């Protein structure tokens, strides 16, 4: 890939145009280092997608390839459908700090956000304990 001078606004526009064409994609977020303005050489563009139905692996690869060709940057795709159950903190961070690229169904997006929030609030006290204990060990040199 060549040196990339694409702006965040251009990434948002191009990614939205490409993803919106796929009938199986209901909504998508841009998240990660580009959104936080922490881009370094070699940073990839993180995109999270919610699918109407479970996509085939080849379909995901095709989406990733289409995005990489159009945006001229390495793409890291996250599938949102099962994220609240498997990684509630990441799901929460995506909807809280990410940029919504588009949605085709407001009610599905609203229900998804509700589910993410409930799962995150369920595990947050445990995450806080784990993080506090981890930091204590680091500070004590263990």
For each of these PLM feature ranges, what is it?
Residues 1-24, 36-37, 52-142:
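Catalytic core of pol beta-like nucleotidyltransferases
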Residues 26-34:
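Short gly/ser-rich loop at a beta-strand->alpha-helix junction or flexible surface loop bordering the NTP-binding
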Residues 40-43:
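Short glycine/proline-enriched turns and hinge-like loops at secondary-structure junctions
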Residues 46-50:
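Short beta-strand->loop micro-motif that forms the acidic, two-metal-ion catalytic signature
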């Amino acid at each position: 890939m060549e040196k990339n001078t694409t702006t965040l606004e251009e990434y948002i526009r191009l990614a939205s145009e490409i993803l919106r064409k796929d009938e199986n994609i209901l909504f998508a977020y841009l998240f990660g280092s580009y959104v936080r303005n922490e881009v370094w050489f070699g940073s990839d563009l993180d995109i999270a997608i919610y699918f109407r139905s479970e996509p085939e692996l080849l379909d995901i690869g095709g989406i990733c390839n289409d995005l990489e060709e159009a945006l001229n940057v390495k793409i890291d795709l996250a599938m949102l459908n099962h994220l609240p159950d498997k990684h509630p903190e990441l799901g929460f961070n995506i909807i809280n700090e990410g940029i919504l690229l588009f949605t085709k169904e407001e009610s599905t997006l609203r229900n998804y956000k509700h589910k993410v929030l409930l799962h995150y609030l369920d595990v947050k006290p445990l995450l806080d304990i784990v993080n506090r204990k981890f930091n204590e060990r680091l500070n004590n040199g263990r």
